[in-house]
């Protein structure tokens, strides 16, 4: 599958309005089937749902956007330890390409992780994605962690809602410049911002 797509690795500032429109359409079509609310942030042409990524890996094929992964460097707190990570998020594969191996092509982001000199990449996924993530992690490149809660700020302020939410999600950790044994202990991760 990776030979049929071309990858564009770019900084957020390199995207044009037309790129954001195409990505917003991609996210509506990709996230919409998982629940109408999941596509809502993208209905206005915005190509991000919470925090805005600084780098993106976008795969294109003859039908447009095929896959996407966003990256944002940030400090999170794991237990009592502040930790610089590259948060990975805004992951999607066009529905007609699911199951064809394109997820493994997201490894196009790995050289960027090394270039940014972050100790770890970090991301979260729903428990419903566990089987998919286990297949992805089978080669030991990434690790799935369970039993962790992640607290994030809401992307928008609402007077009738709390400012943060705490979720029980699967945590994906990719050792980049440090071994997995150096990931801090702790059952709560403070994202200190909105989910990517």
From Swiss-Prot:
Belongs to the NodA family. One of its GO terms (cellular component) is cytosol. It comes from Rhizobium leguminosarum bv. viciae. N-acyltransferase required for nodulation. Acts in the production of a small, heat-stable compound (Nod) that stimulates mitosis in various plant protoplasts. GO terms for molecular function: acyltransferase activity. Its EC number is 2.3.1.-. HAMAP family: NodA (MF_00084). The gene is nodA. It holds the Pfam family NodA. It is found in: Cytoplasm. This is Nodulation protein A. Keywords: Acyltransferase, Cytoplasm, Nodulation, Plasmid, Transferase.
């Amino acid at each position: 599958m990776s030979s049929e797509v071309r990858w564009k690795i770019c900084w957020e500032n390199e995207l044009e309005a037309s790129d954001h429109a195409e990505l917003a359409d991609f996210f509506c079509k990709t996230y919409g089937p998982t629940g109408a609310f999941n596509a809502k942030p993208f209905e206005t042409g915005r190509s991000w749902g919470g925090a805005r990524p600084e780098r993106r890996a976008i795969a294109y094929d003859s039908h447009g956007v095929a896959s996407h992964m966003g990256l944002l460097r940030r400090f999170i707190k794991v237990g009592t330890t502040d930790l610089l990570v590259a948060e990975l998020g805004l992951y999607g594969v066009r529905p007609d390409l699911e199951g064809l191996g394109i997820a493994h092509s997201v490894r196009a982001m790995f050289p960027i992780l090394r270039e940014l000199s972050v100790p770890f990449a970090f991301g979260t996924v729903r428990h419903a994605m566990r089987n998919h993530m286990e297949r992805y992690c089978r080669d030991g490149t990434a690790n799935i962690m369970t039993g962790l809660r992640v607290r994030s700020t809401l992307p928008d302020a609402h007077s009738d809602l709390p400012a943060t939410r705490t979720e029980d999600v699967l945590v994906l950790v990719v050792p980049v410049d440090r071994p997995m044994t150096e990931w801090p202990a702790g059952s709560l991760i403070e994202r200190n911002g909105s989910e990517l």
